[in-house]
Amino acid sequence: SRFKIGENIRIKEGVLKGNNAIFMGINENQRVSVLLSMMGRKLNISMPSLSLQAY
C-alpha cells in the first residue's frame, strides 16, 4: 500500500469527498479501511484505494 497504518489521508472522490480520515489497512480485495470522524462518532469504512490521497 502507498499509505502507512495511522497515516492521515483525505478522501478525494465520492460522497465523502473532502473529508479527512486515518488509514487503517487494506484487505484482500484491494479496498482500504479508514477511520472517519463524523458527527462526533468514529466510523470504520472501506473504499477503493484510488479514492484517497495523502494529507
Task: For the regions a language model picked out, list residue spans one by one.
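Ferredoxin-like alpha/beta domains used as RNA- or RNAP-binding modules
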Residues: 1-55
